[in-house]
Curated annotation (Swiss-Prot):
UniProt keyword annotations, A-Z: Antibiotic resistance, Cell inner membrane, Cell membrane, Membrane, Signal-anchor, Transmembrane, Transmembrane helix, Transport
Residues exposed to the Cytoplasmic side: 1-12
This protein's name: Multidrug resistance protein MdtN
Entry function: Could be involved in resistance to puromycin, acriflavine and tetraphenylarsonium chloride.
Signal peptide positions (record): none
Ranges in the topological domain labelled Periplasmic: 34-343
Length: 343
């Protein structure tokens, strides 16, 4: 009777290898999860501005519709320019009239200046005559005692000296009057500068009546139409700056140690989760509103915790700038998923 051969014992090496590989994979997954934070608590966002007119007036042209994309320099709306055109025409007419008045006044001033120069020459002549009369009197008076001149000669010298002084005072008054008349054109020149400033301001207001897009963007919250009276500094609609899109991703505070500015990120939007976008961390938030009713600071974002009956890690917003965003997919508030590369 033949005996059956015994089966060789199976090696345990393959099983141990599988277990080892599983442990390595588990360690890798744990490391990956710990060093490469990920969150689905994220949303797309972009900077916005309120489009406000800087002058008041009735809207006569509205060149955009709600949710329309615009390019930098595109016409948004136009305010009735007629009041500002009228103000400009009035100011320019005032300037023309003032220039004519200045021209006529300048002619008069030139004549007055000529008269003033003549009076100044007369003043010098009168001053010389008064000096001569005074010198003559000073020489004549001592001669009376010596008998070389008569008292009548001395009286005539005194009369001549007084007359010369009177003539000098008279021409000095004429010179002062002529000088004051010459300075009268300065006020008109100063008034012209004020009118020119008014013209410049009116031209600026007329330019502001036409409002154009300051950058590439998209119009939202448009709730007005042609004929509406627009008040200066009151918003007409909002304009999204579509040149730069970013994602606000709320990460647990325990993940922040692995996040820093410049960390590469992968972004997916809920509207099309099969498409990914690359980005980089721009900044990490340093303040959120607490849930326990503690100190509240205006302007801080509020990030709700997922469970409020268990002490869980707070979440802080991380701003991720998106490279080459799809303008048709990105919308403010769109749900997103953010995955950061391990650091």
């Amino acid at each position: 009777m033949e005996s059956t051969p015994k089966k060789a014992p199976r090696s345990k090496f393959p099983a141990l290898l599988v277990v080892a590989l599983a442990l390595v994979a588990l360690v890798f997954v744990i490391w990956r999860v710990d060093s490469a934070p990920s969150t689905n608590d994220a949303y797309a966002s972009a900077d916005t501005i309120d489009v406000v007119p800087e002058v008041s007036g009735r809207i006569v042209e509205l060149a955009v519709t709600d949710n329309q994309a615009v390019k930098q320099g595109d016409l948004l709306f136009r305010i009735d320019p007629r009041p500002y055109e009228a103000n400009l025409a009035k100011a320019e007419a005032s300037l023309a009239a003032l220039d004519k008045q200045i021209m006529l006044t300048q002619r008069s001033v030139d004549a007055q200046q000529f008269g003033a120069d003549s009076v100044n020459a007369t003043v010098e002549k009168a001053r010389a005559a008064a000096k001569q009369a005074t010198d003559t009197l000073r020489r004549t008076e001592p001669l009376l005692k010596e008998g070389f001149v008569s008292a009548e000669d001395v009286d005539r010298a005194r009369t001549a000296q007084r007359a010369a002084e009177a003539d000098l005072n008279a021409v000095l008054l004429q010179a002062q009057s002529a000088a004051s008349a010459v300075s009268g054109v300065d006020a008109l020149v100063a008034q012209r500068a004020a009118v020119e400033a008014d013209i410049a301001l009116t031209k600026l207001h007329l330019e502001m009546a036409t409002v154009r897009a300051p950058f590439d963007g998209r119009v939202i919250s448009l709730k007005t139409s042609v004929g509406q009276f627009a008040s200066a500094m009151r918003p007409i609609f909002t304009l999204i700056d579509t040149r730069h899109w970013y994602v606000i991703a709320n990460f647990r505070e325990t993940d922040l140690k692995n996040i820093r500015s410049g960390t590469p990120a992968t972004i997916r939007l809920m509207s099309d989760s099969g498409k990914t976008f690359e980005g980089k961390v721009d900044s990490i938030g340093y303040g959120v509103l607490p849930d326990d009713g503690g100190l509240v600071l205006g302007g801080l974002p509020k990030v709700s915790r997922s469970i409020n009956w268990v002490r869980v890690a707070q979440r802080f917003p991380v701003k991720i700038m998106v490279d080459k965003p799809d303008p048709e997919m990105f919308r403010i508030g769109a749900s997103a998923v953010a995955n950061l590369e391990p650091q």
